[in-house]
UniProtKB/Swiss-Prot annotation:
It catalyses: alpha-D-glucose 1-phosphate + ATP + H(+) = ADP-alpha-D-glucose + diphosphate. This protein plays a role in synthesis of starch. It catalyzes the synthesis of the activated glycosyl donor, ADP-glucose from Glc-1-P and ATP. Keywords: Allosteric enzyme, Amyloplast, ATP-binding, Chloroplast, Nucleotide-binding, Nucleotidyltransferase, Plastid, Starch biosynthesis, Transferase, Transit peptide. Pathway: Glycan biosynthesis; starch biosynthesis. PANTHER family: GLUCOSE-1-PHOSPHATE ADENYLYLTRANSFERASE LARGE SUBUNIT 1, CHLOROPLASTIC-RELATED (PTHR43523:SF12), GLUCOSE-1-PHOSPHATE ADENYLYLTRANSFERASE-RELATED (PTHR43523). Heterotetramer. Prominently expressed in the leaves. A lower level expression is seen in the roots. It comes from the Eukaryota. The keyword Cell inner membrane does not apply. PROSITE patterns: ADP_GLC_PYROPHOSPH_1 (PS00808), ADP_GLC_PYROPHOSPH_2 (PS00809), ADP_GLC_PYROPHOSPH_3 (PS00810). This is Glucose-1-phosphate adenylyltransferase large subunit, chloroplastic/amyloplastic. It holds the Pfam family NTP_transferase.
Amino acid sequence: MDASAAAINVNAHLTEVGKKRFLGERISQSLKGKDLRALFSRTESKGRNVNKPGVAFSVLTSDFNQSVKESLKYEPALFESPKADPKNVAAIVLGGGAGTRLFPLTSRRAKPAVPIGGCYRLIDVPMSNCINSGIRKIFILTQFNSFSLNRHLARTYNFGDGVNFGDGFVEVFAATQTPGESGKKWFQGTADAVRQFFWAFEDSKSKDVEHIVILSGDHLYRMDYMSFWQKHIDTNADITVSCIPMDDSRASDYGLMKIDHTGRIVHFAEKPKGSDLTAMQVDTTVLGLSDLEAMSNPYIASMGVYVFRTDVLMELLNRKYPSSNDFGSEIIPSAVGESNVQAYLFNDYWEDIGTIKSFFDSNLALTQQPPKFEFYDPKTPFYTSARFLPPTKVDRCKIVDSIVSHGCFLQESSIQHSIVGVRSRLESGVEFQDTMMMGADYYQTESEIASLLAEGKVPVGVGQNTKIKNCIIDKNAKIGKDVVIANTDGVEEADRPNEGFYIRSGITIILKNATIQDGLVI
């Protein structure tokens, strides 16, 4: 059969494809005065259509002769977007500020070093996501209380039995002061932290870095950064912001955006209030949400996760906005009007662990069945420090909807909807309900425990017949026998550091290394 081939001029750009899409391609040509256009094939992903960029398809028109109608010779891939290459991307993990909203958990540690899920730390989330995404060039910027964070990173990701990075690296940069007026200042914000260490990208190890992923160290989620970065490449973006649908109750806590039908961000407002908040409502069906889901989530919120072209980031930080110190409130809103800033939908579990309540709720949510998020996944595991602890020993305990980490000793205890961290010791008669116990950094031998009890002192762990509810117990806490921690008076806020505890949002927090004497009622 004879076949005809048509020369097709391809102009790749974004267009609306259907009501619920903002990523598409248009292919057009002029043949006998007719426009030839092809839409993307669609595949099903989680029950929604997903466009496949980078492939052109031919479409027959009525003014071809019959032989052409029957068969049109074409190349199925007239153009393809470059594929994301992990060797060309580096990640910067922001260690966070003083962590005042997570105080007192951050009184002696940086936010990313806060324990979570029984045996992990918050920094393990972005680090594991990077490893699972193939990113092996990672910079971590720290400033406050960074000792335990640095120790955890060194043990887990750099040396000995930690994760092997091959020709990649993990570099930890602590805030420093240098000669000159500007060098006398500590980090003034997220953008300023990156600005102060931008010289690191001139190093030979970083010379091939074309794109930079900016990550926070206090979020809980599982994400393939390569898919995120591929969207960045496909749309030829200068900056791409990862976003999620957001409801009314929490919208004012985040940066909110409006996007056009191509996915380009046309307006960005950081934590708007009142009428400014209402003005940021959008039809989120454009993200692929159902009408019902869109009604419940009328905002598009930034996750605080960004991809920048390296040259664009350098231009913004050092030349265009040298006095702007924060990405969310200054750099991104300023760049929206002059750069191609794209939105990337992340429609999966994500939580900002920024407050005591969100930290507490996110931890206890891990005990649900099925959980909204879980650390174990055979294809994308989460990594942490190898402790080489023995299995937990359980003696006549009742454990319901809970997580018990390794190396624990539990004797005739009742544990409901709670998390018990590594090396925890619970004596007989202990009752936990809605409680997170972070565990201990060390063991005490039976002889040491007996000696302490003989002297009227309290060993590490929880003593006999103690009842604890709605509580966070920080590491190495010593809680005596017959103690009751329940906040039965419903106190919302209280500071009792001399007594070893705080109350935040109605949640009792037992301090690290604190001692709670026998019989105390909180």
